């Protein structure tokens, strides 16, 4: 397995602790020099000593340098030493320490002043739902703001509709638009990736080696789908009956599989939380089963839902009405059953099942159709940053969405280390909290808004009916409409399939703030 590498710029990348066996992969990737920033013996006997690493590197034709940095941080002398090394070592260079953080910080300090910093009032990291929406909301409040939006992708997706695509109820082409069309007028689109934060200097470093300065920073890059954590999955996706509604190009394949399956075994999976739209894994099951029932083939299909957790849904109020559909579709629930391996050609999946005694057993299951929801985590650049919490998500106050140590930094969307559901509905309310609080901060005023943890999950229990689950922190019900939220309704389907997509493109992304009031306790 190749080491996980974070590219800082064209000539310099960083990595967590390397093994001796990683050096051959680095040479194959084109690196010409390796710098070790981790002191010998810091990680105990399992950490390769720099002498052994140097010998192995030189045998592969790689230059090697040892510049140990303590966990307390780099000194000015060490920054000067790195500058000297960089003038001598052939590039590109790969530096490593325990996590990569010290190597990133040392490089940032060593190259400080050598690059021009472009100044902005506000820098927004990410051009997804949260990034575009909060930028539009800020410009509505103050059109004079100089805002940069960092987003490498040229396409912008409306992801909540992919479930409908997989159920034959939506055109996949209607879920994507060019990023240039949704970028708010007045904002500058920076087509690059974020490489590192330098919060002490109020600067972010980009993949092209440039730097952007900010007075305020909003971090909303979304989350990262960790397909690689399930052995064999990446090679199997899109063929052999293996699919996922978490990818734009695979949602149509799900519908193809559903239409063609007339009998056999259909497995649906849900990884450990948190994930984006926690109801999406079971939505795939419900819409598939509804189609099979209407086609008269459900009795010939064995349906099983494998959940890594111990509950069907995180808010207990909605479990009874959902269980009625599980029973009606004759789906079997397998709790504490986590997908760990897939063999597509042989249509076999393996699950780690945790028993009541805590013992884990590896269970093999055959399938004709396998719908996979991948494990999910914060992006690498967040997890390796000092701005992350202990779980790797972006650290914010759950009410103000402000970073606890850097008050000029806010966050919104899936990247936040908050306990709310990671949904577009949550973003709709978060961006107003962030926009109002950021503007107040710029004026030296008290932050006026508090986020209540609102999130919404329109559970598509059958084609044409939805249970509209709306809730906040602690599972508190926060219904928008004065109706029993546990009842499946046609009106909620119309909201999900017609009104919300229209509002997303014409409302949220344009700074129109409808139904955004929060009700914190």
Predicted regions and their residues:
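A conserved FAD-binding loop/helix module that cradles the flavin
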Residues: 412-461
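FAD-binding core/adjacent interface of flavoenzyme oxidoreductases
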Residues: 190-296, 357-360, 371
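A Rossmann-like FAD-binding core segment of flavoenzymes
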Residues: 144, 187-196, 201-204, 212, ...
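Beta1-alpha1 glycine-rich phosphate/pyrophosphate-binding loop at the start
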Residues: 118-188, 272-316
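FAD-site-proximal beta/loop scaffold in flavoenzymes
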Residues: 235-262, 366-429
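Cys-dependent protein tyrosine phosphatase-like superfamily
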Residues: 1-93, 105-117
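C-terminal auxiliary extensions adjacent to catalytic cores
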Residues: 468-521
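Short, well-ordered coil/turn residues at beta-beta hairpins
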Residues: 36-37, 207, 220-221, 373-374, ...
